[in-house]
Amino acid sequence: MKQNLHPKVNTVVFKDISCDFSFLGTSTLHSSETVKWEDGKEYPLIKVEISSASHPFFTGKQRVMDTEGRIDRFKKRYGKK
């Protein structure tokens, strides 16, 4: 069997940047940023744009989350001339 075939799984903190919500989980992602968690240990910080704390399906609230300017690009491209 090949050695070092699978990526290393680490405990990381995921932070939803749209609603400032953080949770601890496991992932194979790596990050140079770290954050001190509630247990006093430091974990790598992975920033995500959307999570269950901010997604309309889970929150029951509809809101526009145009973090990359997609609506403006669409209007510029296909808007009335």
Curated annotation (Swiss-Prot):
Keywords: Ribonucleoprotein, Ribosomal protein. SUPFAM superfamilies: L28p-like (SSF143800). GO terms for molecular function: structural constituent of ribosome. GO terms for cellular component: ribonucleoprotein complex; ribosome. GO terms for biological process: translation. It comes from the Bacteria. Disulfide bonds: none annotated. Belongs to the bacterial ribosomal protein bL31 family. Type B subfamily. HAMAP family: Ribosomal_bL31_2 (MF_00502). Part of the 50S ribosomal subunit. This is Large ribosomal subunit protein bL31B. It comes from Bdellovibrio bacteriovorus (strain ATCC 15356 / DSM 50701 / NCIMB 9529 / HD100).
